[in-house]
Amino acid sequence: MDLNAFREETRDWLESNCPESMRIGAVHFEDAYELYQTDEAIEWRDRAAAKGWTAPAWPTQYGGGGLGKDEHRVLAEEMARIKAIPPATGMGLAMIGPTILELGTDEQRARHIPKIVSGEAQWCQGYSEPGAGSDLAGLQTKAVLDGDQFIINGQKIWTSGAQYANWMFALV
């Protein structure tokens, strides 16, 4: 697609679909969790997800936008122009999603990536432990294979965003 045409299409779509309340520029980390739970933020996320723009460069087969680097840059520029906050954020998009895309099985990609893109799956990270803090070399939690599943024993603490998450990726 011609980048100028894509820019115009993107600009028009953002003007029509990004709520004014989501055009606030940057959001402080501590405020982001609550903001992204509001009805308007969920509406913004759902509209963007339907277009694949919660994960613009991820493959379309999993709900991503399939954008190349130039289109992705244009989208980012147009969002910045209107001070739109990202339609979705979190550990799913930032950490575990890219890991699953790169290293996961086809089954794992099909199971998890569309739910990350849509916002149905909210992830948190389980790293810190009592007595170890975030010293990853001191982790005590263990995962033991039992048949076809892992049994995890241990404790995790200080899990940012856990109150909003329905999935956790944990270091063991």
What are these regions (language model features)?
Residues 141-144:
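A structural signal for short hydrophobic beta-strand segments in well-ordered beta-sheet cores
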Residues 42-119, 160-167:
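Internal helix-loop-helix
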Residues 1-5:
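Intrinsic disorder at enzyme termini
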Residues 21-47:
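Short secondary-structure junction/hinge motifs that connect adjacent elements
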Residues 148-149, 153-172:
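A short core secondary-structure module
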Residues 119-127:
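A short, Trp-centered hydrophobic/proline-enriched beta-strand micro-motif
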Residues 27-36, 60-64, 96-102, 128-131:
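Conserved short loop/turn motifs at secondary-structure junctions
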Residues 132-135, 150:
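Hydrophobic, small-residue-rich alpha-helical packing segments that form membrane-like cores
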